Swiss-Prot record:
Annotated function: Serine protease inhibitor. Displays antimicrobial activity against the Gram-negative bacterium S.typhimurium ATCC 14028. Displays no hemolytic activity.
GO molecular function: serine-type endopeptidase inhibitor activity
Name the UniProt record assigns to this protein: Kunitz-type serine protease inhibitor 1
Major localization class: cytoplasm
Listed GO biological process terms: defense response to bacterium
Source species: Xanthosoma sagittifolium
Subcellular location(s) of the protein: Cytoplasm
Keywords: Antibiotic, Antimicrobial, Cytoplasm, Protease inhibitor, Serine protease inhibitor
Signal peptide coordinates: none
UniProt keyword Cytoplasm, yes or no: yes
GO CC terms, sorted: cytoplasm
Length: 19
């Protein structure tokens, strides 16, 4: 899980990587 700063929940494991 990567910490995305796109406004989504960073605590949620997502397979999409937001840069």
């Amino acid at each position: 899980p990567v910490v995305d700063t796109t406004g989504n929940n960073p605590l949620q494991q997502q397979e999409e990587y937001y840069v």
